[in-house]
């Protein structure tokens, strides 16, 4: 690292203090490596002087056990918030240095395995921060002045033969890094001076939406990394048959447009022959003949088990092939090892160790839409419908469909009852719902549903009970293979793409001793798991069910599955049974919608209200936002019958607008809070809701009525609320935009040489445009975080022209350019299309397309519905748990301290970080982690996705 100016403030000497011998030695080692300092002090047990030509740093040892414990606790706290909060807001001391090469700093910190935060982004930082062993925040900046705001991307390294094959370093294995690429389409890195690896991909077992996205990502990332890409047609059947007809080399353009197609374009088939050794022997021979030395399998547990067996037998298979003269000595030496990797393509979501499988959310989407449609006809005739869904031994589809459609009853294999119990339970719930005026009855049956004695429960059994015992006009709907059909939803396309990239990384990094990896998603991060261990855990569920050990079967499911089941039972009972809480623990809780409509808002209101009823709380709705309350006292207690159907409706049933409390009338709002004696408040909405919570929390000193627990559930398609990686409505909006883009792309494909510039909403957030770009394979995307430079625009026009030339004579010809509305104030989508058309000089033309408020979506997606339910119930729990913390403060008016952390923490944002639900104080978020003028969080968590999207379409980025 080159330190050109010692400290940002110009000083050249600094002293830091260690309070234990261990931290003292660690600090000497840290600063020696980090700042390339030399130890220039004479031997001394209590101090060390480190320096170079620009800096002198003295480290003192002052042993103090008490202070050292505090330092260790502070350091532990800072490490725990590395990915979620800005260290600078928690720092007691900090040092900041200047550097001429911030990339070298980043590489040094990565080599040291030191924690790291970068601003404005970790990809292209102007400032980098780490933690020293003494609890200090140590920063480095490349800017020349303190108010510089334009990030300077680090220089890209030249590709060389020494580039490491590790996803932990920047190389061909990391598509989320900016590197020098060629000027021609597709823009790829210069080839390395090493033998080309040949990577094949195959899909096996049952097809699943998203498999094509997985294949596309594997083929293109393999090519991007200098490898040859092959596909094995018709699954294991293609391996056994072999030859160029079944093992084909694919090139960049061969997978163009595949993301928008359902099923698997390379085919899949069940192959009994591969289960025999002779079949696997043929498969090995055919792979060797094609020169393939790495295989990625996308399929379920059976397909992945076969792949791992194939790899374990590989040494003996090739020995036998050599002995029988079916391969040459040269082939034997070159193909001694086969690297295998698995990605899970299954609509059942039954694979242990991963939170989601490719295709599961698409199948759930089909089921929910089908039930939404069925409910309309059920309501017309006051009928009951028994809906059978897939899932084998996993009840995930049935459970989440039950939550998303507010079904009356569900049958899942993990929680069976005796034959008489399930009949009594179902009839009790259905009759209670009917007696309260519900005209429809929906019962969801998983195909693996069983009674406690392992007797299968069929839709016919359920139909018979509903007819015979309740006299309901009942119909059976078996969705069957409709659940597998159609194009993948946005989540599955993105998941399949990111897992495809990591699968290529995994096979490139594998050694003969590395266990076969499975690419999984845990806490929203793509990770590798041992393949066979995952398969064994998956099969253990079925074994536990067969052994009637249902407690173990449930324990093998992830904690979120159990939470969903408890949530379903709570919201389904509503106020039909005796409340769980005693009268003195029951609360009055209000809910209000603030900001623009977003998918899932109604689901949150419905779930909050029904959960409150089941506990004994009284739910209130504030209609038409803060202005409705201040002007018209629009407050109403919610009752169950009035909310029927809300779980699956779009928009906002209780009304919403962008008015904040200060704009409406804080005094009147406080008056009505006091009049109705609210014990808690839930706000659902976007950045205006975030502002509202901030204003109410700040007003607590003046208005005692606001001294109650208050919580915000983020809901906005922009996904720009600080404190969460996910806002309700963003998935619905992403799917609406994706479907619009698919249709527009089809139109562009029909007209040769046509590109569409699609205007995306999102305010100053590029989330929607970024993820839609990845999901639909857009050639270019422009977002507010980067803007539109003339140099990049010129490069993009030339790149588009070349891509049209390459695609000549092929199908799926259309091109898409996504532009966030605020990416440029000067260039609207219309103006941008005109500029592109003029500069293209007749080689192609561009037209604008405005999806507008269509992006808010119609029916909310199942992801938004189920997450709304989860977050609403968490919000009610937060209010209940924080009553005691603020109760005393409410009573002691004179001694009220709004700055007390215990008090300020009772106003929070409930958010999703990874797969965890977290609570962040509104004061902490607003003061330290928000760019208020930009209506954005300071840390952009989706930044790396942009480079992945660009690399997968061969776009060249201009630094």
Curated annotation (Swiss-Prot):
Region C-terminal regulatory PFK domain 2, residue ranges: 588-959
A GO molecular function held by the record: fructose-6-phosphate binding
Region listing for Disordered, in residue ranges: 144-167
Result of changing residue 439 to V: Reduces maximal activity of the holoenzyme by less than 25%
Main location: cytoplasm
Impact after mutating residue 481 to S: Increases the KM for fructose 6-phosphate 50 fold
Additional observations: Present with 90200 molecules/cell in log phase SD medium.
Protein's recorded name: ATP-dependent 6-phosphofructokinase subunit beta
Provenance organism: Saccharomyces cerevisiae (strain ATCC 204508 / S288c) (Baker's yeast)
Gene name as annotated: PFK2
């Amino acid at each position: 690292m080159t330190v050109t100016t010692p400290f940002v403030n110009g000083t050249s000497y600094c002293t830091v203090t260690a309070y234990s011998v261990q931290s003292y030695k660690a600090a000497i080692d840290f600063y020696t490596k980090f700042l390339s300092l030399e130890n220039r002090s004479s031997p001394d047990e209590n101090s060390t002087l480190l320096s170079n030509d620009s800096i002198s740093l003295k480290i003192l040892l002052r042993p103090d056990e008490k202070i050292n414990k505090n330092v260790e606790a502070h350091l532990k706290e800072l490490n725990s918030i590395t990915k979620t909060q800005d260290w600078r807001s928690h720092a007691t001391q900090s040092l900041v240095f200047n550097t001429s090469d911030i990339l070298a700093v980043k590489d040094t910190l990565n080599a040291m395995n030191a924690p790291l935060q970068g601003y404005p982004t970790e990809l292209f930082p102007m400032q980098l921060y780490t933690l020293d062993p003494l609890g200090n925040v140590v920063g480095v900046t490349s800017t020349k002045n303190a108010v510089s705001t334009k990030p300077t991307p680090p220089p890209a390294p030249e590709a060389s033969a020494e580039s490491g094959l590790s996803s932990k370093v920047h190389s061909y294995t990391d598509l989320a890094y900016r590197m020098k690429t060629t000027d021609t389409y597709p823009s790829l890195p210069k080839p390395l001076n090493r033998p080309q690896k040949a990577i094949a991909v195959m899909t096996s077992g049952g097809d699943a939406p998203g498999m094509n996205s997985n294949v596309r990502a594997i083929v293109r990332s393999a090519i991007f990394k200098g490898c040859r890409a092959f596909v094995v047609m018709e699954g294991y059947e293609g391996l056994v048959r072999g030859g160029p007809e079944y093992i084909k080399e694919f090139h960049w353009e061969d997978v163009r447009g595949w993301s928008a197609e359902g099923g698997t374009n390379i085919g899949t088939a069940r192959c009994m022959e591969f289960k025999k050794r002779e079949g696997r022997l043929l498969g090995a021979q055919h792979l060797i003949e094609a020169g393939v030395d790495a295989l990625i399998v996308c399929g379920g547990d059976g397909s992945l088990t076969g792949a791992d067996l194939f790899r374990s037998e590989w040494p003996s298979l090739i020995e036998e092939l050599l002995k029988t003269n079916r391969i040459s000595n040269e082939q034997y030496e070159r193909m001694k090892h086969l690297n295998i990797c698995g990605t899970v393509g299954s609509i059942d979501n039954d694979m242990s160790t991963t939170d989601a499988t490719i295709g599961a959310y698409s199948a759930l989407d089909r089921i929910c839409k089908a039930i939404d449609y069925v409910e309309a006809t059920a309501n017309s005739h006051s009928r009951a419908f028994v809906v059978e869904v897939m899932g084998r031994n996993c009840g995930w589809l049935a459970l989440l469909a039950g939550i998303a459609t507010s079904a009356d009853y569900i049958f899942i294999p993990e929680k069976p009852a005796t034959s008489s119990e399930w009949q009594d339970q179902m009839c009790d719930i259905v009759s209670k719902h009917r007696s309260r005026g519900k005209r429809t009855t929906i019962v969801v049956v998983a195909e693996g549903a069983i009674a406690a004695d392992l007797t299968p429960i069929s839709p016919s059994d359920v139909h018979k009970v509903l007819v015979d015992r309740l006299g309901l006009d009942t119909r059976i709907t078996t969705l069957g293979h409709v659940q597998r059909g159609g194009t993948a939803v946005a989540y599955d396309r993105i998941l399949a793409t990111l897992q495809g990239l990591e699968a290529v990384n995994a096979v490139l990094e594998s050694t003969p001793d590395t266990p076969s990896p499975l690419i999984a998603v845990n806490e929203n991060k793509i990770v590798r798991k041992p393949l066979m261990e995952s398969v064994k855990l998956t099969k253990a569920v079925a074994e536990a069910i067969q052994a009637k050990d249902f407690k173990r079967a449930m324990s093998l499911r992830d904690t979120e599955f159990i939470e969903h089941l408890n949530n379903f039972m709570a919201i389904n009972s509503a106020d039909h049974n005796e409340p769980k809480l005693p009268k003195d623990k029951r609360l009055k809780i209000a809910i209000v919608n603030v900001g623009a409509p977003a998918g899932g808002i109604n689901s949150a209101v419905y779930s909050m209200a029904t959960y409150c009823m089941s506990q004994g709380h009284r739910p209130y709705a504030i209609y038409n936002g803060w202005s409705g309350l201040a002007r018209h006292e629009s407050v109403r207690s919610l009752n169950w019958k009035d909310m029927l159907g809300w779980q699956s409706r779009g928009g906002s049933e209780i009304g919403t607008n962008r008015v904040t409390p200060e704009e409406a009338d804080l005094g009147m709002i406080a008056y009505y809070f006091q009049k109705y004696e609210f014990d808690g408040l839930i706000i659902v909405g976007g950045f205006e809701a975030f502002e509202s919570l901030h204003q109410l929390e700040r007003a607590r000193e003046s208005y005692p009525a606001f001294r109650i627990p208050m919580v915000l559930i983020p809901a906005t398609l922009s996904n720009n609320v600080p404190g969460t990686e996910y806002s309700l409505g963003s998935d619905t909006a992403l799917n609406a935009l994706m479907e619009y883009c698919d249709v527009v792309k089809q139109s562009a494909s029909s007209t040769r040489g046509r590109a569409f510039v699609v205007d995306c909403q999102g305010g100053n957030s590029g989330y929607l445009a970024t993820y839609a770009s990845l999901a639909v394979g857009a050639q270019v995307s422009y977002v507010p975080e980067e803007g539109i430079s003339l140099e990049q625009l010129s490069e993009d026009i030339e790149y588009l022209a070349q891509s049209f030339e390459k695609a000549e004579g092929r199908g799926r010809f259309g091109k898409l350019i996504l532009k966030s509305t605020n990416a440029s104030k000067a260039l609207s989508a219309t103006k941008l299309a005109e500029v592109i058309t003029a500069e293209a000089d007749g080689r192609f033309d561009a037209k604008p397309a405005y999806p507008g408020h269509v992006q808010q979506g119609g029916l909310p997606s199942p992801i938004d519905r189920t997450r709304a339910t989860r977050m609403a119930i968490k919000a009610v729990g937060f209010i209940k748990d924080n009553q005691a913390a603020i109760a005393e403060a409410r009573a002691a008016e004179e001694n009220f301290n709004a700055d007390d952390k215990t008090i300020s923490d009772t106003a929070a944002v409930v958010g999703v970080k990874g797969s965890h639900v977290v609570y962040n104080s509104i004061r902490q978020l607003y003061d330290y982690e928000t760019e208020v003028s930009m209506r954005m969080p300071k840390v952009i968590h989706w930044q790396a996705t942009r480079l992945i999207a660009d690399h997968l379409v061969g776009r060249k980025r201009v630094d």
